């Protein structure tokens, strides 16, 4: 029913959603985006993947100047390293960050031109948090959806490693009721 529709007062009309979910060669696609040399955050779901993608992009990049602008970021880095990466990104020394959701919490950099969701977000809240990094200065910015069907399976695997499965929850519930 239309009378139940809620309009979000925080809609940012400067953001352009780019549906790239059909892309087969993600690294090649990212390499093309890297060549634009605009502030970009590529969000991934694991620390390992952040490191792997940063290395793959460096390996493919023929431009030494651009190669030095690529960096990975995750919560496992030392606090001093994270601060330095944030500072260098803010100042334009770095322009292409591959990160877990750690690069988003408490970080307000207005001129981020591209946010790439390489993997499927774990929740709507996380999606909004990550996508919301783009275009905070009011300029046109892009949110690129690069995830695919396999990412659903990856999320389920990652969640299963950190969350109890149904059988364990049932057993726990029965134990509480006994």
Residue spans for each PLM region:
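Interdomain hinge/linker at the junction between the two RecA-like core domains of SF2 helicases
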Residues: 1-35
């Amino acid at each position: 029913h239309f009378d139940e529709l809620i309009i979000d007062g925080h809609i940012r009309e400067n953001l352009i959603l780019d549906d790239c979910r059909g892309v087969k060669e993600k690294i090649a696609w990212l390499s093309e985006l890297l060549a634009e040399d605009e502030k970009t955050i590529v969000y991934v779901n694991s620390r390992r993947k952040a490191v792997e993608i940063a290395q793959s992009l460096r390996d493919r990049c023929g431009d030494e100047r651009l190669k030095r602008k690529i960096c990975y970021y995750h919560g496992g880095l030392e606090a001093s390293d994270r601060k330095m990466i944030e500072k260098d990104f803010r100042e334009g020394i770095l322009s292409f960050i591959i990160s877990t959701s750690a690069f988003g919490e408490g970080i307000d950099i207005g001129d981020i031109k591209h946010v790439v969701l390489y993997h499927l977000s774990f929740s709507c809240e996380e999606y909004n948090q990550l996508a919301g990094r783009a275009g905070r200065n009011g300029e046109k910015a892009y949110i690129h959806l690069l995830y695919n069907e396999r990412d659903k399976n990856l999320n389920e695997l990652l969640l299963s490693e950190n969350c109890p499965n149904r059988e364990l929850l049932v057993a726990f519930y029965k134990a509480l009721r006994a």
